[in-house]
Amino acid sequence: MCIRDSNKGIVHDYLLEKPGVLYVLCSHFHPDHFNREVLSWKKLRPDIRYIFSKDILKHRRASAEDATYINKGDTYEDEHIRIQAFGSTDVGISFLIDLQGRRLFHAGDLNNWHWSEESTPQEIRKAEGDFLAEVRELQQTAPAVDVVMFPVDSRIGKDYMRGAEQFVERIKITIFVPMHFSEDYQGGNAFRQFAESKGCRFLSIAHRGESFELPNL
């Protein structure tokens, strides 16, 4: 079982009580993606395995013995899981995860981040170029992904879905999960129509702590 990026949010007790090895992945040190509380879980689960972006160690949010740290281009692999670190257009990394015959991608802060109402044309072109370069690298390894978790953040302005649109146009996705929208569920779920037009199943999120079972992909 994997638990990715943790904020002050909700991890139901049953997740910590489920059998099997527990993996916790954190993509970078920003507080909406990393919370030191996750390190306390090892008291309940001595078998827990932490896979963190190396910037978390650099910024002294955790110590060297707390986790396995990886950078873009690194791979963590054991008898259960394979995790490849890809790039970000902010800090840290994104995760490509192969687990039990399924392939998952967690974008971290990888996105086409620009504020079209505020950014200059040059800034917009650079943001888009940097983003598409990272997507091309991922596409070479993973032209198709079963589950993608990707930012759909209306706080960046009217073109906030552009990065998500470009992503699903380039990589075949079975299930798309919006994220990074804070409490703006309507804004995150607004991507549903476009995702479904590209053949994705879209998971609409209604509240914090909502869970989904995905037995058949």
Task: Describe every region a protein language model picked out.
Residues 4-29, 33-41, 110-141:
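Pre-active-site segment of Zn-dependent metallo-hydrolases
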Residues 50-104, 203-216:
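Metallo-beta-lactamase
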